[in-house]
């Protein structure tokens, strides 16, 4: 069973909104004042968007492949896929870019499908290292290519707006599978294509 599609049906919209009111009171606010009357509803609706990935199975996006280009066997790279996620430790935003590459083995998908896989995993509570591995594993398991490379750059609000308060800092993680891990030339070609760090991510 794909647990990513499960929702907690026992929690109602009203209960979720009341939880927001509780947090507002805890912060020292009055949720009944005019400016905050609609805030609980808006927050719950925003959460429905931010965490819509739990209602999807990313593997589904990679099921349809292009038969007419199944003979293509050179590297395919999609770079600078922007994403927004949330840190599972502080529920703070993570904003950045994902770069994906693979060496097809008879299965080629539309490039938008790779971006949808990224979105599906990003729209959940995440740790960047875990998300990197999840995207790579999804592509490897579904398309069975000769190799997969995933590199993620992310600026973490839990570091820039609290705690150490360091702006302009970005985190880079990578996951290499198959030929991307075993062949230094393949890995170098991929990294040259994506040019990590050429654009500063600020949060």
From Swiss-Prot:
Entry GO CC: cytoplasm
Record's InterPro entries? GTP-CH-I_C/QueF (IPR043133), GTP-CH-I_N (IPR043134), GTP_CycHdrlase_I (IPR001474), GTP_CycHdrlase_I_CS (IPR018234), GTP_CycHdrlase_I_dom (IPR020602)
Name the Enzyme Commission number(s) assigned to this protein: 3.5.4.16
List the Gene Ontology MF annotations in alphabetical order. Answer: GTP binding; GTP cyclohydrolase I activity; zinc ion binding
Q: Name one GO biological process term.
A: tetrahydrobiopterin biosynthetic process
**Tree of life domain:** Bacteria
- One Pfam family from the record: GTP_cyclohydroI
| tRNA-binding listed as a keyword | no
Q: Note whether Cell division occurs among the keywords.
A: no
- HAMAP family for this protein: FolE
- What NCBIfam families does this protein's entry cite? folE, PRK09347.1-2, PRK09347.1-3
Assembly information from the UniProt record: Toroid-shaped homodecamer, composed of two pentamers of five dimers.
Listed name of the protein: GTP cyclohydrolase 1
Give the organism the record lists: Xylella fastidiosa (strain Temecula1 / ATCC 700964)
